[in-house]
Regions:
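Short, internal strand/loop/helix patches
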Residues: 115-152, 157-158
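A short beta-strand-turn-helix
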Residues: 40-60
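Bacterial N-terminal signal peptides that target proteins for export
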Residues: 2-14
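Short active-site neighborhood of thiol/selenol oxidoreductases, capturing the structured segment around
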Residues: 53-73, 185
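Bacterial N-terminal signal peptides
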Residues: 12-23
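Thiol-/selenol-based redox modules, centered on thioredoxin-like
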Residues: 150-210
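Structural microenvironment flanking redox-active thiols in thiol-disulfide oxidoreductases
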Residues: 73-121, 132-139
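Sec/Tat signal peptide C-region and signal peptidase I cleavage site
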Residues: 23-29
Length: 210
């Protein structure tokens, strides 16, 4: 009996340890509003090195994306994301897509494929950062796609995480809801602090490399 109890205790401890070590790094370090946004350097879809510091002095939007995710498709099929990108570009805002899906997992693409996807859906980000190792995604604690981060002209994180106020995956659910990214950009444009600076994440889990 004593042996069985000890054996079960060992199994329980091993299970707890496995769960602890399996917790993704994305759960550990959510960036802070008002603090410097996590600096990064990555490679874009054309092989160019891109750093966040390249855009100091400009407002920037980071869009963690996965074209196979229904929540991402919701915003692209309705033209919502493209409209945001166009309006942002018109205001001199830099919009960067970040693709953190690991090779062999849902949403992974190479540079040519990423550009073809955007051309097909008329998306116009300023750049596409390929992040197959998940380094940039983890820096921003991106748990889901889409994850949105708005960085002000001083380099501080001004808004973080959900694109809007409705976590329904159907395209019709966009109508009549508050778009948090659009609202944040409008406030920054006139020199105001973002009134709703942090929201609850929703979407598909980011397909990080193990």
């Amino acid at each position: 009996m004593e042996i069985i109890i000890k054996y079960r205790s060992l199994i329980a401890l091993a299970t707890v340890a496995a769960l602890l070590f399996s917790v993704p790094q994305t759960a550990l370090a959510t960036p802070d509003i008002g603090k410097p946004a996590p600096a990064f350097t990555g490679t874009d879809s054309r092989g160019k090195t891109v750093s966040l510091n390249d855009f100091r002095g400009k407002i920037a939007v980071l869009e963690a994306t996965n074209h196979d995710c229904p929540y991402v498709r919701k915003h692209y099929s309705a033209g919502n994301m493209q409209a945001l990108q166009r309006d942002a570009a018109g205001d001199g805002i830099v919009w960067l897509q970040i693709i953190s899906s690991a090779p062999g997992l849902e949403g992974h693409v190479n540079g040519r494929e990423a550009e073809a996807l955007n051309a097909g859906r008329k998306a116009t980000p300023a750049g596409i950062l390929l992040d197959p190792k998940g380094n940039i995604g983890r820096q921003y604690a991106a748990r889901h796609t889409p994850t949105m981060a708005v960085i002000d002209a001083t380099g501080a994180l001004a808004y973080y995480v959900a694109i809007d106020s409705n976590s329904n995956g159907h395209p019709d659910s966009i109508k009549g809801v508050k778009n948090h990214v659009r609202a944040a950009l409008a406030e920054l444009k006139v020199g105001r602090m973002v009134s709703v600076a942090k929201t609850r994440t929703y979407g598909c889990s980011v397909k990080y490399v193990n």
